[in-house]
Amino acid sequence: LIVDQIHTFIGQFHILEGVSLQVPKGAITVMLGRNGAGKTTTLKSILGLTPPREGKIIFDGMEIQGKRAFNIANLGIGYVPEHRAIFRALSVMENLKLAERKNGDFNRNADFIFNLFPDLKRLYKLPGNHLSGGQQQMLAVARALVPDNKLLLIDEPSEGLAPILIQQMMEAIRVLCQKTTVLLVEQNFLMASQLAKNYTIIDDGKSVQNGLMENLVNDSD
């Protein structure tokens, strides 16, 4: 994925002012920045939910800016928004089946998901509103894994989680990277530094720094 100098507006407000970043295939890249810096808007711009007015977004060699969100998703880009987007009245299994794409291999992907999140296998009949906050977050991530996505955009997966659940989520994201490329938004620097190979810092709607996470960690010591 290559994001090149995108400018995104929400109404009359100029939210992103020339954001650029690259997400190498098969690795985890993290976007860092304070609240309100433009990280979530960057994800939504990639997905076509808040389309940029200027700049390019290239995925698998194809320019995707200007395409409808549905068509972008069908190219193999999955999204895990913050705030645990699940169907709370539906069971775990129903939530997963609703995320299936036509001609997908649900059973194979379900096996992968249940190996990744054993709690979901144990609770597969329970409705989403009976799950804990951490289990709901796991289900939100799992829903994005039902299709065979090439790129997964994950927004603040550790938000509101207890330390033991953060550790479980970290292990799950590590395993995910063996299957798909990940662009992660994360405020927890310790988690981000242990997961990501590359980073981009967003500040006030601009990408101000990027590079190898290893170098950023060494600079902050």
Label every model-predicted segment.
Residues L1-V3, L16:
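Conserved structural motif at the start of ABC-family nucleotide-binding domains
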Residues L145-K150, K179:
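A short, proline-enriched helix->beta-strand linker immediately N-terminal to the Walker B motif
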Residues P127-L131, Q135:
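Conserved ABC ATPase signature
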Residues L32-R34:
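The feature captures the beta-strand-to-loop junction immediately N-terminal to the Walker
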Residues L47:
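Helix-to-loop junction immediately C-terminal to a conserved catalytic motif
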Residues I166-K179:
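Helical segment within the ABC ATPase nucleotide-binding domain
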Residues G55-I64, L75, R108-A110, N115:
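Conserved ABC transporter NBD signature motif
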